[in-house]
From Swiss-Prot:
SMART domains: PLAc. Its EC number is 3.1.1.5. This is Lysophospholipase 1. Keywords: Glycoprotein, Hydrolase, Lipid degradation, Lipid metabolism, Secreted, Signal. Residues 1-22 form the signal peptide. It catalyses: a 1-acyl-sn-glycero-3-phosphocholine + H2O = sn-glycerol 3-phosphocholine + a fatty acid + H(+). Gene3D superfamilies: Cytosolic phospholipase A2 catalytic domain. The gene is PLB1. It comes from Candida glabrata (strain ATCC 2001 / BCRC 20586 / JCM 3761 / NBRC 0622 / NRRL Y-65 / CBS 138).
Length: 659
């Protein structure tokens, strides 16, 4: 389709046939013992990229080179100083491959709203989308090296990546199929609609799968249930929603092995029961097809995702030559990044639902949280006895028997930027797709960027840099939350930082042809609603199909080349100067209190002393890397049966629909 016209032209989505042969060793949701090398060590220090990622990048760089050069030439072809643009592109794509810009894309959380609106934004960058080259940014996705997702954004990135790198175009064109991806016409609690037998059977299967894992001796929580339920919507052609499908299986998919797609990265936060996480102290975990871990000084380690569930000490299996495989179920890891249960508990007082329902929901969800059931349990802890934690930091993460992970946006960083701004990944530009519901009307207000910027001044942000951004009042008052905005346009203003961070292209969800500001907890969408939100996302990412600014695609090209152009002291086309005037935040501040936005806490007035205060607050090393020894070693498990699960999800859904 042209997403703005919704024209069906593409063949139906093929079944997954990308050469995957791994799957769970039990062909079920239950992990199992497998043999592994006697000298294997599953842990490494976070001092650089893994060798697996380095080797994969060599192949990806070959593919992105041609795609990016083609994209840049196309979007700058209408520059009056075309020769200047061509010369710059030729210089960047000379024999020295280190001069070629590297791109990352980050899709925010926000439930199905973020998944669908983010899908529209990503489709605008995909040359497989009809009309994306003419009316959008087609080819940009093919030129990207990384694609990060969090919560609802993670549902998007996982759907595309683990369905043989399918396209949003294909998904939309296949909506009439019996086994259509993203068929969310019925709530996750009642997938059969009026067909109660289908609903009952679905929940029996979910209950059986999770109960079997529990009987095998593995801890389970509602994250297992949540992930299993979601999987049916994202992998409908696979047996029971991919009950045996693994995160590490992507390594064996031809489209990934050949680096024909960006590397997907998902994000979650570390949290122990009884603690809270904020932007300054959270331990941000990332998981790629190769590894799970964190760059943060509270852990500074990565482990092989394929052998999660193995009992280890400093990365060495407790039993020589024996590991666990099958723990990394794709639904479980996908559900880990989107544990909406505790997200609702944290934000319920900010909702407008009736007080008596709020009190009931708070009581119900508080009981869940106190029982630790809202947390994804990774046990045994893959980082047990890890020796890479900063000496000035609590070692709770490595001393605990269990690793607890929650929704990646719980620390306020709802756009998963942390993995993409690491110096080791050396990106020049990151596209931040923000579909958060920050304001009272469920639009973004830049809070996520504010939190990521602020984090660099705390202990956990050591060694990470991020360009200056304003607070939420300024975002709203200047309208920065209603159109694409560039941050960090001039590297000369950041020479005092440890390294020059990527330029950030902020693309917020905003109203164009459809009200895409649905509630995070809206659990069902009609086909009309799905297509409306996707279409609006396409328009938000393209300045309304380039009708609001016919030069917008060229400006994106300028932004992509900016870091390398400055580093190499090359001549910039004059059109790029105009672009930067129009789209770069120029430092203007407007602290007038804006209605219904995330509190900035006088963020716009922050100075060096404020940053020092932030660092001081973080020095205690509390929150995600601390708790009482009783809580951090508490066994966590849910008594699983179909009736209990159905009752829990039904009650949650009834409340969510009132938000």
């Amino acid at each position: 389709m042209q997403l703005q016209d919704l024209v069906v032209t593409v063949s139906l989505l093929a079944a997954f046939n990308g050469g995957v042969e791994a799957w769970s060793p039990t062909n079920s949701y239950v992990p199992a013992n497998v043999t592994c090398p006697n000298d294997i060590n599953l842990l490494r220090n976070a001092t650089g990229l893994s060798q697996s990622e380095i080797d994969w990048l060599k192949k990806r760089d070959v593919n992105t080179r041609e795609a990016l050069e083609s994209f840049l030439k196309r979007v700058t072809s209408n520059f009056t100083s075309n020769s200047s643009a061509s010369n710059l592109i030729d210089q960047l794509f000379s024999t020295n491959s280190s001069n070629i810009p590297k791109i990352g894309i980050a899709a925010s959380g926000g439930g199905y709203r973020a998944m669908l609106s983010g899908a529209g934004m990503v489709s605008a960058m995909d040359n497989r989308t009809d009309g994306a080259n003419e009316h959008g940014l087609g080819g940009l996705l093919q030129a990207a090296t990384y694609l990060a997702g969090l919560s609802g954004g993670n549902w998007l990135t996982t759907t595309l990546s683990w369905n043989n790198w399918t396209s949003v175009q294909d998904i939309v064109d296949s909506q009439d199929n019996d086994s259509a991806i993203w068929d969310i016409s019925h709530s996750i609690v009642s997938p059969g609609g009026i067909n109660i037998f289908k609903t009952g059977s679905r929940w029996d299967h979910i209950s059986d799968a999770v109960e079997d894992k529990q009987k095998a001796g593995f801890n389970v929580s509602l994250a297992d249930v949540w992930g299993r339920a979601l999987s049916y919507q994202f992998f409908p052609t696979l047996y029971r929603g991919g009950v045996a499908y693994l995160w590490s299986d992507l390594r064996e998919s031809d489209v990934f092995k050949n680096a024909e797609m960006p590397m997907p990265i998902s994000v979650a936060d570390g949290r122990y029961p009884g603690t809270a996480v904020i932007d300054l102290n959270s331990t941000v975990f990332e998981y790629s097809p190769f590894e799970l871990g964190s760059w943060d000084p509270s852990l500074s380690a990565f482990t092989d995702v394929q052998y999660l569930g193995t009992k280890v000490s400093d990365g060495k299996p407790a039993e020589e030559g024996k590991c666990i495989a099958g723990f990394d179920n794709v639904g479980f890891l996908m559900g880990t990044s989107s544990t909406l249960f505790n997200q609702f508990l944290l934000r319920i007082n900010d909702t407008s639902i009736p007080k008596f329902i709020r009190n009931l929901a708070t009581h119900f969800l508080k009981d869940l949280s106190e029982d630790y059931d809202d947390i994804a349990v990774y046990a045994p802890n893959p980082f047990r006895d890890a020796d890479y934690v900063n000496n000035n930091r609590s070692k709770s993460l490595s001393e605990s028997e269990y690793l607890f992970l929650v929704d990646g946006g719980e620390d306020g960083q709802n756009v998963p930027l942390v993995p993409l701004i690491q110096q080791e990944r050396d990106l020049d530009i990151v596209f931040a797709l923000d579909n958060s519901a920050d304001t009272e009307e469920n639009w973004p207000d830049g809070a996520s960027l504010m939190h990521t910027y602020r984090r660099q001044f705390g202990f956990q942000g050591q060694g990470v840099t991020f360009p200056s951004v304003p607070g939420t009042d300024t975002f709203v008052n200047l309208g920065l939350n209603k159109k694409p905005t560039f941050f960090g346009c001039d590297a000369r203003n950041m020479t005092d930082l440890e390294y020059i961070p990527p330029l950030i292209v902020y693309i917020p969800n905003s109203r164009h042809s459809y009200n895409g500001n649905t509630s995070t907890f809206k659990l069902s969408y009609s086909e009309k609603e799905r297509l409306g939100v996707i279409r609006n996302g396409f328009e938000a990412a393209t300045m309304n199909n380039l009708t609001a600014d016919s030069n917008f695609a060229g400006c994106i090209g300028c932004a992509i080349m900016r870091r390398k152009q400055q580093a190499l002291n090359l001549t910039l086309p004059k059109e790029c100067e105009t672009c930067f005037t129009n789209y770069c935040w120029n430092g203007t501040i407007d602290n007038t209190p804006a209605k219904g936005v995330t509190a900035s806490n006088d963020f716009d007035n922050a100075s060096g002393s404020a940053a020092a205060d932030m660092a001081e607050q973080d020095a205690s090393g509390a929150a995600s890397a601390s708790s009482s020894s009783r809580k951090k070693n508490a066994a966590v498990s849910v008594d699983v049966n179909a009736k209990t699960l159905f009752a829990i999800i039904t009650a949650m859904t009834a409340v969510f629909q009132l938000i």
